[in-house]
Curated annotation (Swiss-Prot):
Ranges annotated as biased composition (Basic and acidic residues): 60-69
Tissue expression pattern: Expressed by the venom gland.
Keywords of this entry: Secreted, Signal, Toxin
Protein name per Swiss-Prot or TrEMBL: U-scoloptoxin(21)-Sm2a
Length: 69
């Protein structure tokens, strides 16, 4: 069983040498890295022509405020 695992590890290391470098979103840097990744993904979604776009908030209607008990 150990020998089979060793072969798989060696094969995966050989394949990884030919790949392009991975993009680092900072996910391995803890909480601040996760926040940075979420920020960058949000910017990408807001600027994507097929994406949801920027959040637009409706204006507050004064009548709704006045009717509040």
């Amino acid at each position: 069983m150990f020998f089979l695992g060793f072969i798989i590890v060696c094969a995966s290391e050989e394949q990884s040498d030919n790949r392009l470098p991975n993009i680092d979103f900072g996910l391995d840097r803890g909480h601040s890295g996760r926040m940075t990744a979420e920020y960058l993904m949000g910017l990408a979604a807001a600027n994507d022509p097929n994406g949801p776009g920027r959040r637009r908030r409706s204006p507050i209607v004064r009548e709704e405020i006045l009717r509040h008990p």
